[in-house]
């Protein structure tokens, strides 16, 4: 029997399940555990290869007949918001974001629960309890933060009402947005878009070149918003390809 080093990741393949993005397709995922002293280093390496993190698991699609899921990362240092994106920034100028330690709160869960009920009531996360939420935030062996967005108080400082939050990993070369959510009662603010814009600005100020947005699927309305943040890179079999306003993918 082969003895594997505890530092050598072991990969597993899930059984096929219905794809949540493309009707009539089946999805499978390859995954491994992120534990131990090398978890952060492994998470960085796997993220560069198109994996995503969920708690102490790193996964990526491994579907038999489909390669539609494409990993996307925004080039933070070159990003310039379009006119419409500048409007989103202006609309949310009264919000203050603070990057905090990954500690769950009842206030966060209240927003999270309302967001799921309004946006994803039939999804795989619909039944998450407060304990499930706490696990999502705390079960991490990598550098994870939660960015809270609150209304600015009369004094101009943070401390007002929480309206959104983003669970975020800090990688060696960027910020990876693990999961973000917002108060559905202020849907007109485009808070999902605003949080991405804020993360791009944060990455730039931290000297990090990229913001990882997860998977983009061409033709999927659920994923189309990710194509708005240009220039970006998309992972292909030949490595990361640059996509700018022309929509043409080129080797960077």
UniProtKB/Swiss-Prot annotation:
Q: Which SUPFAM superfamilies match?
A: Acyl-CoA N-acyltransferases (Nat)
PANTHER family under this entry?
ARGININE-TRNA-PROTEIN TRANSFERASE 1, ARGINYL-TRNA--PROTEIN TRANSFERASE 1
Localization, per the record, is: Cytoplasm
Look up the domain of life of the source: Bacteria
Which GO terms of the cellular component aspect does the record hold?
A: cytoplasm
Coarse class of the primary localization is cytoplasm
Q: Which organism is it from?
A: Afipia carboxidovorans (strain ATCC 49405 / DSM 1227 / KCTC 32145 / OM5) (Oligotropha carboxidovorans)
**GO MF entries:** arginyl-tRNA--protein transferase activity; leucyl-tRNA--protein transferase activity
Q: What is this protein called?
A: Aspartate/glutamate leucyltransferase
Q: Which NCBIfam families match?
A: PRK01305.1-4 (NF002343), PRK01305.2-3 (NF002346)
One Gene Ontology biological process? ubiquitin-dependent protein catabolic process via the N-end rule pathway
The gene is bpt
Keywords of the record, alphabetical order, are: Acyltransferase, Cytoplasm, Transferase
Q: Which reaction does it catalyse?
A: N-terminal L-glutamyl-[protein] + L-leucyl-tRNA(Leu) = N-terminal L-leucyl-L-glutamyl-[protein] + tRNA(Leu) + H(+); N-terminal L-aspartyl-[protein] + L-leucyl-tRNA(Leu) = N-terminal L-leucyl-L-aspartyl-[protein] + tRNA(Leu) + H(+)
EC numbers for this chain: 2.3.2.29
Q: Which family does it belong to?
A: Belongs to the R-transferase family. Bpt subfamily.
Q: What does this protein do?
A: Functions in the N-end rule pathway of protein degradation where it conjugates Leu from its aminoacyl-tRNA to the N-termini of proteins containing an N-terminal aspartate or glutamate.
